[in-house]
């Protein structure tokens, strides 16, 4: 995807289309207020680590990209079905149809970015490159609306620079603070009005008719021990995930389970935290 806020029908999110479990595996926070899969910098760093891991597995960048799209298991299976070929184009007929088209689309996009002008395309340069911005650690919960008001910054600009804040609210926890990214020209305005921004935020949050949502992280990695009477559908319902996800996380080819078997599950059951907002 070429949009930081992109989200697919199956839940792949952000510029690098991270699924929930893979994002968590590579350190991206997903909570009721924050989804770092939307953050271009953090998600790109995570994607680089993931791709490096896949390259270490397959020793080939084309295969690493195919595995990025469909998972290690599907690429390994395609290699086996192809008779052992270690080349993307030889195993392509044995890959899922979406993955068969993924690498050509990726390479075509890469080519267009590199040679756009040679083919008559006009490249729109960003009006606010990353080096023209900076971050501030927020000491008290605030909304982007309040920042926009006191720094005279367009709301669209703030949302563009801070895409990971799902509710346009920057939370503060007892044990963690978050950062606000601003144009360099607006840093001084924020610092000058910081106390007033916090005071306004406190008053507005207290005056809300509907209370703010509870902050909870969706990050539980669980090692589950299969018990008598368990089957994948039952376990999936228990942890609010899909059977296909459990199979993918554990490299299962069938639905067969053994008593005592250990399963890795990335549960969506929330872990609640207290907001340090007022």
Task: Give, region by region, the residue ranges found by the protein language model.
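Short, surface-exposed glycine/acidic/tryptophan-bearing loops
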Residues: 6-27
């Amino acid at each position: 995807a070429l949009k930081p806020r992109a989200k697919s029908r199956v839940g792949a999110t952000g510029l690098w289309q991270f699924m929930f479990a893979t994002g968590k595996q590579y350190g991206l926070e997903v909570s009721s207020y924050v989804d770092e899969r939307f953050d271009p910098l953090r998600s790109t760093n995570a994607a680089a680590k993931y791709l490096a891991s896949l390259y270490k597995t397959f020793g080939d960048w084309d295969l690493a990209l195919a595995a990025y799209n469909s998972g290690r298991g599907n690429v390994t299976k395609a290699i086996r079905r192809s008779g052992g070929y270690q080349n993307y184009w030889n195993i392509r007929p044995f890959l899922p149809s979406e993955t068969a088209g993924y690498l050509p689309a990726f390479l075509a996009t890469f080519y267009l970015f590199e040679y756009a002008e040679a083919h008559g395309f006009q490249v729109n340069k960003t009006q606010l490159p990353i080096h023209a911005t900076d971050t501030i650690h927020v000491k008290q919960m605030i909304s982007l609306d309040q920042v926009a008001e006191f720094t005279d910054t367009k709301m669209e600009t703030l949302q563009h620079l801070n895409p990971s804040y799902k509710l346009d609210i920057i939370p503060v926890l007892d044990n963690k603070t978050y950062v606000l990214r601003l144009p360099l020209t607006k840093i001084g305005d924020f610092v000058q009005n910081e106390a007033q921004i916090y005071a306004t935020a406190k008053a507005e949050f207290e005056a809300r008719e509907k209370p703010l949502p509870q902050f909870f992280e969706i990050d539980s990695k669980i090692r589950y021990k299969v018990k008598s009477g368990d089957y994948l559908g039952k376990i999936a319902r228990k942890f609010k995930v899909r059977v296909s996800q459990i199979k993918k996380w554990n490299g299962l080819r069938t639905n067969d389970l053994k008593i005592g078997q250990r399963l890795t599950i990335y549960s969506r059951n929330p872990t609640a935290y207290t907001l340090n907002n007022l």
